[in-house]
UniProtKB/Swiss-Prot annotation:
Motif 'HIGH' region, residue range(s) on this chain: 35-45
An example molecular function term from Gene Ontology annotations: glutamine-tRNA ligase activity
Subunit-structure text: Monomer.
UniProt protein name: Glutamine--tRNA ligase
InterPro entries found in the cross-reference section: aa-tRNA-synth_I_CS, Gln-tRNA-synth, Gln/Glu-tRNA_Ligase, Gln_tRNA_ligase_bac, Glu/Gln-tRNA-synth, Glu/Gln-tRNA-synth_Ib_cat-dom, Glu/Gln-tRNA-synth_Ib_codon-bd, Glu_tRNA_lig_a-bdl
Superkingdom of the source species: Bacteria
Principal place of residence: cytoplasm
An annotated GO cellular component: cytosol
Native source species: Buchnera aphidicola subsp. Acyrthosiphon pisum (strain 5A)
GO biological process: glutaminyl-tRNA aminoacylation; glutamyl-tRNA aminoacylation
Positions contributing to ATP binding: 36-38, 42-48, 232, 262-263, 270-272
NCBIfam families in the record: glnS, PRK14703.1
């Protein structure tokens, strides 16, 4: 896949950039990825990361990583570390050093003073609730604060008192003086600064007033020389304030903001607030639970950087909000793992088979391919003995004409091996089948049986070639396509989103994994034949108990001939 070519051909933002570069030959493309360090990155952030960094590469420009760290109440160093790790994991490197909006706090304070001196900002003492009430609605204009017409000198002095910590939290704020009757609610005297008494992870206790996102963002873009500030559609109205602040301060550089649709994924929730509810209620294990689309969760589930970037390329960049099929994301990783995953056999729900015509010392070795279509991936050895395991779902006691696997009185072929015939079953005290007694036809290795009818094939593992393992079978967390739109999204939790199985993998394969278990950065992927694609779960695995996460099943349901999306209002 030529990602750059795809971007250039399909991206409407490229048309804007091409026009800008043609009109100004001296212009260098300069963008940024500006996350708030208040949570973990998800698949929606990946779309923005890929867009900004790929555009910077395409136009031989630069892409900064800047943390918009203007709210110390919600921010944490652990999020900064996680975000940097995720960006590097995706294969991108930001320009120069990591930047922080907090590096510009003094300059931002000076810009705020400029607005006050121009009569374009004032210190207000209304509470949050009163500000919301005074703001009005889409149908009714707002009304002026009683503190709106203070003198410039009074506002200068009050803002300085805010900076010195003379007011308590919520007692005062700095607001832009624009138009309380504006058709755009965001322009109705928005708050520019508020008071927060808490230690900041970068500036410590130097500041107790903090700029709002809208004030800091545009000015940080200007300070860094950003040419194209790309954001999602929910910030479309914020552009009015973005441009107003730049126009009314003494900035020397004027970046331009452009909006594209955010990524909305079927059966998924991206809201940090809602994910936290799921965690607090113990519905999911944490921010890296493979049932949610954070990057750490997708990585744990077995998604690769290239599969995520391929997905972001396929969905493209538009101005229309759509609900993207989850099967498209699965298609991207399935297509990759089909080429790269080692083939091996695993038994998730074991049932024992005793081959009565083979003695207890019988042992035969088979050399099998690690990949049927790629000899360069090598081979591995499996052993065949008189006692083996098959999956419980591959046997049926009662006759069923439509059932094509092993049945009592019928035959089946073992993968890479012989045809066996089920003759008798043994049950435990609870009535569950504990053993299947079978006859092994040793004349059928690579040959048809005497009746010339080839039976179906099932996978198996010799009892002497097993290593116990846990298997986590993940499904969608929600049973409706758009849980984000539901007021009570908890009503739509899929109770079968995680099923745990305990069985076996091939011993030699397992022993190789155990040697690497201490290195969490090693990615190991398998196709468990006839089951699906799995990866090792380095978080839950121990040396004496391996845990595998199902990345995706074998069956592809996405129609690659067209990009299927649904209007976001549809469920």
């Amino acid at each position: 896949m030529d990602t750059k070519k795809e971007i250039k051909n399909n991206n409407f933002i490229c048309q804007i950039i091409n026009k800008d570069l043609n009109e100004n030959k001296n212009l260098s493309f300069y963008t940024r990825f500006p996350p708030e360090p208040n949570g973990y990155l998800h698949i929606g952030h990946a779309k923005s990361i890929c867009l900004n960094f790929e555009l910077a590469s395409l136009y031989k420009g630069r892409c900064n990583l800047r943390f918009d760290d203007t709210n110390p109440l919600k921010e944490n160093i652990k999020y900064i570390k996680s975000i940097k790790y995720d960006i590097n994991w995706l294969g991108y490197k930001w320009h120069g050093n990591v930047r922080y909006a907090s590096e510009y706090f003094l300059k931002l304070y000076q810009y705020a003073q400029e607005l006050i001196k121009k009569g374009l900002a004032y210190v207000d003492h209304l509470t949050k609730e009163q500000i919301r009430e005074y703001r009005g609605t889409l149908n009714t204009p707002g009304k002026n604060s009683p503190y709106r017409n203070r003198t410039i000198q009074e506002n200068i002095e009050l803002f300085e008192k805010m900076k010195k910590g003379d007011f308590s939290e919520g007692e005062a704020c700095l607001r832009a003086k624009i138009n309380m009757s504006s058709s755009s609610i965001i322009m109705r005297d928005p708050v520019l600064y508020r008071i927060i008494f808490i230690k900041h992870h970068q500036t410590q206790n130097k500041w107790c007033i903090y700029p709002m996102y809208d004030f800091a963002h545009c000015l940080s873009d200007s300070i860094e020389g950003i040419t194209h500030s790309l954001c999602t559609l929910e910030f479309q109205d914020n552009k009015f304030l973005y441009n107003w602040i730049l126009k009314n301060t003494s900035v020397k550089h004027y970046p331009k903001q452009y909006e594209f649709s955010r990524l909305n994924l079927e059966f998924s929730i991206l809201s940090k607030r809602k994910i936290k509810i799921l965690i607090d209620k113990n519905i999911i294990e944490g921010w890296d639970d493979p049932r949610i689309p954070t990057l750490s969760a997708l990585r744990r589930k077995g998604y690769t950087p290239s599969s995520i970037k391929n997905f972001c390329q396929k969905i493209g960049v538009t101005k229309q909000n759509n609900l993207i099929e989850f099967s498209m994301l699965e298609h991207c990783i399935r297509k990759e793992l089909n080429q790269t995953a080692i083939r091996t056999m695993a038994i998730l729900d074991p049932i024992k088979i005793f081959l009565y015509n083979l003695d207890s010392n019988y042992k035969e070795e088979f050399i099998v391919p690690n990949h049927p279509n790629n000899p360069e991936m090598g081979t591995h050895k499996i052993i065949f003995t008189n006692t083996i395991y098959i999956d419980r779902s591959d046997f049926k006691e009662k006759y069923d004409k439509k059932y094509k696997r092993l049945k009592l009185g019928e035959k089946i072929r073992l993968r890479y091996s012989y045809i066996i015939h089920a003759e008798k079953i043994e049950k435990d005290e609870y009535g569950n089948i504990s053993n299947i007694i079978c006859y092994c036809d040793l004349n059928t290795l690579g040959r048809k049986p005497k009746d010339n009818k080839n039976p179906a094939v099932i996978h198996w593992i010799s009892e002497k070639n097993t290593l116990s393992a846990e298997f986590k079978l993940y499904d969608q967390l929600f049973n409706i396509k758009n849980p984000e739109q539901q007021e009570n999204f908890l009503l739509y939790i899929n109770s079968k989103s995680l099923i745990k199985k305990f069985g076996f993998i091939e011993k030699k394969i397992g022993e190789e994994i155990q040697k690497k278990i201490s290195n969490n950065n090693i990615e190991i992927f398998f196709q468990f034949e006839r089951i699906g694609y799995f990866c090792i779960d380095f978080i839950d695995s121990k040396k004496n108990q391996l845990v595998f996460n199902r990345t995706v099943g074998l069956r592809d349901t996405w129609d690659s001939k067209k990009i299927k999306t649904k209007n976001i209002t549809n469920n």
